[in-house]
C-alpha cells in the first residue's frame, strides 16, 4: 500500500508540474501575441523626453515606449492598435505569395495539355463583374485619404485559404496602386500649392533675384567689362554685391515669415493673435526697415549701371546710404526692434516646439508649407535664427568694403563713420537685450511674490513688492545668508538700482525673510569685502543702518562677479534726492508729471528738427527755381537737437553761434565794411535818398553805396564764380554761402528755442529742491559758456548786449531767491519772538514763586518764635507752604520747558537769555536764601509760632509708625486748607 500511495503521489505531482508549465507557456504566448500586433513585434525600450510617437506625434515617456525592430517605429503602448501593418512583414508576405503563386502556376501548366493563354481567364481570374463588386466603384476608391490607406489583409480577409491566389494578387496590386496614386496626388498638390504661394510672395523681387542670381559680382557682369577694372575694384564690388544680395535674401526671409507662416497660421489654423505674435515678434517693423534699405541699395545700383547694359555696374559711393541707415531715427528703430526680437528668441523657439508637439494640424501645415525645395531651408526655426544673426553681418561686410576702398577719401571717411555707427548699434542692441531679459526676470519674480509681503525699513516705512517695479534689475542669484546663530539661509538676492533685496521662497512664493537684520540694504556707501580665509564668502557692510551681512556664493567665480557688479552699482547709485528709497503716491504723481514734461520736450525738439529740415529743402528748391541749378543741398549741423547728451550745445553757445552766423550773413550781403545801424529798439531807420533818387540804407567805409537785398553783390560775385583757394579747390559761390548761412541761422535759433524749453522744464522741476541744487544746476548749464568766454577774443557790442540780457535774467533769479530768504528770515524771527515771550512768562512765574517761598519762610520763622517744635518730630520736615506742593516749583517749571530745536540745514537761533546761566543763578540764590537743613531747623524753633499753632489746632505727635504713615497720606487739599487757616490766623 505504501508503494501504491507513493506512485499515486508522484503521478499527481508530475501532473501538477506539467499543468504549471503549460500555463506558463500559454502566458508567454499571450504576452508574445499581445506584442505582435499588425505584423509588428514590439519590445519595450527607454527613450528621451524629445522622442515623438509615430502614431499620435506626441512626446513619449520612458515607461510607455515600444519599438518595432522590423520597421523601426516607436510608439506609445496605447497606440499600438491604431498603427498600420508593418511594411517589412507586408513585403515578405507579398514575396512569399508571389513565389507560391508562380510554383502553383507551373504545376498547373505541367498537368494541363493547353497553355495558359488558351485557357479562359475565368479559370484563374474572376469575372469583371465580380471584380467590380469586390473592389467597389472608382468614386469610392478616390475618396480614400493618404492617412487612412487600405491594406490587402483587410480586403482579402473575407476569403479563406482556399481562395485563388490570383484573386489575392489582384487585390494586393489594386490596393497598392490605389494608395500610391493617392499619395502621389496629395504630395504633388501640396508642393504645387506651396510653390504657388512662394511665387506670389516673391513676385515683387523677381527681377531683382534674377539680377543677383550669380554668386559674385565677377560672375554677374560681362567678362569684357570685368577686364577693364583693377583687382582692388573687383574685390570691393564683390563685397558690395554680397551686401545687396544678402540684404535681398534677408528681406525674402522676412516676407516668408510674415506672408507665408504668419498669414497661414492666422487664416488656416485660426491660432490666437497673441500666440502668433509670440512666434514672430516685430517682424512687420523689421520688414519695413530692411525693405526700405534694400530699395535704396537697388536704386543706387540702377544709377551705377553702364549705359546700354542691365548687368554691368560699378558702385563708387555707398557710405552715405550706410550712414543714413545706421544713424538717427532709423538706428533707433533698428535698436528697439532687434532688441525685442532677439530677447524673445528662445521663447519663440520653445513655443514653436510645443505647438509642433501637441497640435497635429500645426504639423500638417508646416509640412505643407515647407514642401518646395526653396522653402526646405526656411522653416520657422531657421527663419528666426537667420533674422537674429543678420545684424551681426553688417560690421564684417562694411569693414571688408573699407579695406578694399582706395582713392576717394570722402568715401573712406563715410565708411569709417558707418562702421563706428554699426558697432555702436550692436552694443546698444546687446544692452537692450540685457535690459529686456532682466525686465522679464523682474516681472517673473514680482508675479511670484506674495502680495501681502512687506518688510520694515528703518526710518522709511514698509517696503512692499510694488517698490521692485520702480527699479531696474541689475543682477540676481541664490546665495547663502549666515544668520547671527550661525545657520545658513537660502535667499534670492536682487541687485537693483539703489538697493540689495533679500527674498526667501516659501510655498512656491517669495517673501521677505524675517531675520534679525533688514531685508533691504541701501547701496549708498555700501562696502563689499571678501572673507580672507574663505573662497566663497563675502561681507556686505551697510552704513545706514550700520549692519554687516555675511553671504556665501556657490563658487569663487560667482563671488568675484557679485563683488564686481555690486561695486559698479555703488558707484552709479543715484542720490536719495533724485531717487527716494520708498515713494509715496504724491511723489509718484510728481515723477509721472516730470516724465511727461520731458517727453513733451523731446517731441518739441523732434518737431523743430523736422521744421529745420523742411526749411532747408524749401530754400534749396527756391534757389534752384531762381536759376541755381546743380546747387548742393545745405547740410545741417549734426547733433544740434541732441540736448540730452553730455556733448549737447548749451543755450549760450547756440546764441553765440547764431550771432556769428548773422555777422557772416551781413558781411556776405552788404560787405565787411558796413556796420548795421539797426538795433532791437529801433525797428527801422529812415532811408536817405541819394543823388539818383534811390534810397540807400547803408554806406560803406569809403562812401560807396550798397543795397541790402544783395542783388548787386551777388550778381557781381556770380560773375567771379570760378574763384579758387590756394590749394586750387573750387570755392562756393556767394549764393550758396548765403543759403548755407541762412539755414544754419534758422537751425541755431530753433535749437536755442529747444534748449531754452528744456532748461525751463529742468529748472521748474528742480525748484522745490532748494537754492543749493539750483545753483549747481545753473553752474553746470553755464559751464560751456564760461569756457567759451575764457578763450574768446574781445567781446562785440552784440555779444555784450546778449551777456547783459543773461545777467539781467540771472539777477532776476537772484532777486527772487533773496525774497524767499527774507520771507524765511521773517518766519524765523516770529518764531524767536514767540519763544522769548514764553521765556518771559516763565521768568515771571518763577519770580512769583520765589516771593511766595520768601513769605512762607517768614511765616515759618514767626511760627518758630511762638512755639518751637522738637527737631526729631517727623512733621517738622513738612513743607512750609502747602501751596508749594500743588504748584510747580520755579526750577522744575523752567527745566520742563523745552524750546523747539532748529531744523536740520537751518541757522541756529541766538536767544537773548542763556538757559544755563539763568538756572545757575536761580540755584545759587535759592541756596543762599534757604540755607542748609540744619539752619532751617534752627530757625523754626520759635516758641511764639509753636504756641499759636498749639492754640489753633492742638496737634500731638504720633504714637506709632502706623499713625505716622497715616499722617503722611493726608490729601493735598486738606493740607492746603490747614495752610490757609494758619495763614488767616497769623
From Swiss-Prot:
Transmembrane segments: none annotated. Changing residue 679 to A: Reduces phosphorylation level. It is found in: Cytoplasm, Cytoskeleton; Cytoplasm; Cell junction, Tight junction; Golgi apparatus. Induction: Up-regulated by bacterial peptidoglycans stimulation, such as muramyl dipeptide and in biopsies from inflamed mucosal areas of Crohn's disease patients. Phosphorylation of Ser-886 by PAK1 induces binding to protein YWHAZ, promoting its relocation to microtubules and the inhibition of its activity. Phosphorylated by AURKA and CDK1 during mitosis, which negatively regulates its activity. Phosphorylation by MAPK1 or MAPK3 increases nucleotide exchange activity. Phosphorylation by PAK4 releases GEF-H1 from the microtubules. Phosphorylated on serine, threonine and tyrosine residues in a RIPK2-dependent manner. Residues 920-939 have a biased composition (Basic and acidic residues). Changing residue 896 to A: Abolishes phosphorylation by PAK4, self aggregation in the cytoplasm. Increases activity. Residues 131-161 are annotated as: Interaction with DYNLT1. PROSITE patterns: DH_2, PH_DOMAIN, ZF_DAG_PE_1, ZF_DAG_PE_2. The DH (DBL-homology) domain interacts with and promotes loading of GTP on RhoA. Promotes tyrosine phosphorylation of RIPK2. This is Rho guanine nucleotide exchange factor 2. It comes from Homo sapiens.
Amino acid at each position: 500500500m505504501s508503494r501504491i500511495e507513493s506512485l499515486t503521489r508522484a503521478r499527481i505531482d508530475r501532473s501538477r508540474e506539467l499543468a504549471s508549465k503549460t500555463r506558463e507557456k500559454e502566458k508567454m504566448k499571450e504576452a508574445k501575441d499581445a506584442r505582435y500586433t499588425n505584423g509588428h513585434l514590439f519590445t519595450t525600450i527607454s527613450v528621451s523626453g524629445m522622442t515623438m510617437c509615430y502614431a499620435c506625434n506626441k512626446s513619449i515617456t520612458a515607461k510607455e515606449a515600444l519599438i518595432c525592430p522590423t520597421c523601426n517605429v516607436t510608439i506609445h503602448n496605447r497606440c499600438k492598435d491604431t498603427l498600420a501593418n508593418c511594411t517589412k512583414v507586408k513585403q515578405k508576405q507579398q514575396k512569399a505569395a508571389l513565389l507560391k503563386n508562380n510554383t502553383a502556376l507551373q504545376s498547373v501548366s505541367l498537368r494541363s495539355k493547353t497553355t495558359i493563354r488558351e485557357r479562359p481567364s475565368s479559370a484563374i481570374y474572376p469575372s469583371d463583374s465580380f471584380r467590380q463588386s469586390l473592389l467597389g466603384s472608382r468614386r469610392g476608391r478616390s475618396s480614400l485619404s493618404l492617412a487612412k490607406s487600405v491594406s490587402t489583409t483587410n480586403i482579402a480577409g473575407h476569403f479563406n485559404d482556399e481562395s485563388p491566389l490570383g484573386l489575392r494578387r489582384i487585390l494586393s496590386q489594386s490596393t497598392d496602386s490605389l494608395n500610391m496614386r493617392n499619395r502621389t496626388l496629395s504630395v504633388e498638390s501640396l508642393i504645387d500649392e506651396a510653390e504657388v504661394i512662394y511665387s506670389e510672395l516673391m513676385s515683387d523681387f523677381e527681377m531683382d533675384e534674377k539680377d543677383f542670381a550669380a554668386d559674385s559680382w565677377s560672375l554677374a557682369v560681362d567678362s569684357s567689362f570685368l577686364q577693364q577694372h583693377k583687382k582692388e575694384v573687383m574685390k570691393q564690388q564683390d563685397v558690395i554685391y554680397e551686401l545687396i544680395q544678402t540684404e535681398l535674401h534677408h528681406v525674402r526671409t522676412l516676407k516668408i515669415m510674415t506672408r507665408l507662416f504668419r498669414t497661414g497660421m492666422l487664416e488656416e489654423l485660426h491660432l490666437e493673435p497673441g500666440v502668433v505674435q509670440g512666434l514672430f515678434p516685430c517682424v512687420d517693423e523689421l520688414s519695413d526697415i530692411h525693405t526700405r534699405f534694400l530699395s535704396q541699395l537697388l536704386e543706387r545700383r540702377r544709377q551705377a549701371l553702364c549705359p546700354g547694359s542691365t548687368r554691368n555696374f560699378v558702385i563708387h559711393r555707398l557710405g552715405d546710404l550706410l550712414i543714413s541707415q545706421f544713424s538717427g531715427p532709423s538706428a533707433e528703430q533698428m535698436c528697439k526692434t532687434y532688441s525685442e526680437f532677439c530677447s524673445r528668441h528662445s521663447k519663440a523657439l520653445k513655443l514653436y516646439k510645443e505647438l509642433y508637439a501637441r497640435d497635429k494640424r500645426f504639423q500638417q501645415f508646416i509640412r505643407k508649407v515647407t514642401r518646395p525645395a526653396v522653402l526646405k531651408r526656411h522653416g520657422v526655426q531657421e527663419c528666426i535664427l537667420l533674422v537674429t544673426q543678420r545684424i551681426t553681418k553688417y560690421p564684417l561686410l562694411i569693414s571688408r568694403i573699407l579695406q578694399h576702398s582706395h582713392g576717394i577719401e570722402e568715401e573712406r571717411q563715410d565708411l569709417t563713420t558707418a562702421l563706428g555707427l554699426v558697432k555702436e548699434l550692436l552694443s546698444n542692441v546687446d544692452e537692450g537685450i540685457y535690459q529686456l531679459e532682466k525686465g522679464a526676470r523682474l516681472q517673473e519674480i514680482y508675479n511670484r511674490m506674495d502680495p501681502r509681503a512687506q518688510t520694515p525699513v528703518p526710518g522709511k516705512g514698509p517696503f512692499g513688492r510694488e517698490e521692485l517695479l520702480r527699479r531696474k534689475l541689475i543682477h540676481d542669484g541664490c546665495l547663502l545668508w549666515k544668520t547671527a546663530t550661525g545657520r545658513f539661509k537660502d535667499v534670492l538676492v536682487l541687485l537693483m538700482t539703489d538697493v540689495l533685496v533679500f527674498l526667501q521662497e516659501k510655498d512656491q512664493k517669495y517673501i521677505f525673510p524675517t531675520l534679525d537684520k533688514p531685508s533691504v540694504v541701501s547701496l549708498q556707501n555700501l562696502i563689499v569685502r571678501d572673507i580672507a580665509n574663505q573662497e566663497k564668502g563675502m561681507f556686505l557692510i551697510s552704513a545706514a543702518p550700520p549692519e554687516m551681512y555675511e553671504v556665501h556664493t556657490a563658487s569663487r567665480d560667482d563671488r568675484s562677479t557679485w563683488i564686481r557688479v555690486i561695486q559698479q552699482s555703488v558707484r552709479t547709485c543715484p542720490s536719495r534726492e533724485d531717487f527716494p528709497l520708498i515713494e509715496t503716491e504724491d511723489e509718484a504723481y510728481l515723477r509721472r508729471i516730470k516724465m511727461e514734461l520731458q517727453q513733451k520736450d523731446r517731441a518739441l525738439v523732434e518737431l523743430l528738427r523736422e521744421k529745420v529740415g523742411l526749411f532747408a529743402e524749401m530754400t534749396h528748391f527756391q534757389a534752384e527755381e531762381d536759376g541755381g541749378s546743380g546747387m548742393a543741398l545745405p547740410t545741417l549741423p549734426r547733433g544740434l537737437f541732441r540736448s540730452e547728451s553730455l556733448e549737447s550745445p548749451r543755450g549760450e553757445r547756440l546764441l553765440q553761434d547764431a550771432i556769428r552766423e548773422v555777422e557772416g550773413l551781413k558781411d556776405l550781403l552788404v560787405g565787411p565794411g558796413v556796420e548795421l545801424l539797426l538795433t532791437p529798439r529801433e525797428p527801422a531807420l529812415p532811408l536817405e535818398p541819394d543823388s539818383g533818387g534811390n534810397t540807400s540804407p547803408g554806406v560803406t567805409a569809403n562812401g560807396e553805396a550798397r543795397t541790402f537785398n544783395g542783388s548787386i553783390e551777388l550778381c557781381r560775385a556770380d560773375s567771379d564764380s570760378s574763384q579758387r583757394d590756394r590749394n586750387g579747390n573750387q570755392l562756393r559761390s556767394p549764393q550758396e554761402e548765403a543759403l548755407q548761412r541762412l539755414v544754419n541761422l534758422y537751425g541755431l535759433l530753433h535749437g536755442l528755442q529747444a534748449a531754452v524749453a528744456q532748461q525751463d522744464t529742468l529748472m521748474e522741476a528742480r525748484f522745490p529742491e532748494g537754492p543749493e541744487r539750483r545753483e549747481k544746476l545753473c553752474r553746470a548749464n553755464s559751464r560751456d559758456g564760461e569756457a567759451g568766454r575764457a578763450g574768446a577774443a574781445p567781446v562785440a557790442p552784440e555779444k555784450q548786449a546778449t551777456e547783459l540780457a543773461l545777467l539781467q535774467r540771472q539777477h532776476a533769479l537772484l532777486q527772487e531767491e533773496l525774497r524767499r530768504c527774507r520771507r524765511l528770515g521773517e518766519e524765523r524771527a516770529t518764531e524767536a519772538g514767540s519763544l522769548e515771550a514764553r521765556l518771559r512768562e516763565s521768568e515771571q512765574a518763577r519770580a512769583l514763586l520765589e516771593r511766595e517761598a520768601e513769605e512762607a519762610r517768614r511765616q515759618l520763622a514767626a511760627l518758630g518764635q511762638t512755639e518751637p517744635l522738637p527737631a526729631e518730630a517727623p512733621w517738622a520736615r513738612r513743607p512750609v507752604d502747602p501751596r508749594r506742593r500743588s504748584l510747580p516749583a520755579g526750577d522744575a517749571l523752567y527745566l520742563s520747558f523745552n524750546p523747539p530745536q532748529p531744523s536740520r540745514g537751518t541757522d541756529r537761533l541766538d536767544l537773548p537769555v542763556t538757559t544755563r546761566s539763568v538756572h545757575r543763578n536761580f540755584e545759587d540764590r535759592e541756596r543762599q536764601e534757604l540755607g542748609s537743613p540744619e539752619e532751617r531747623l534752627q530757625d523754626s524753633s520759635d516758641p511764639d509760632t509753636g504756641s499759636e499753632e498749639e492754640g489753633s489746632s492742638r496737634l500731638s505727635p504720633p504714637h506709632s509708625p502706623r499713625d505716622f504713615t497715616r499722617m503722611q497720606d493726608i490729601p493735598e487739599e486738606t493740607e492746603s486748607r490747614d495752610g490757609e487757616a494758619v495763614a488767616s490766623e497769623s
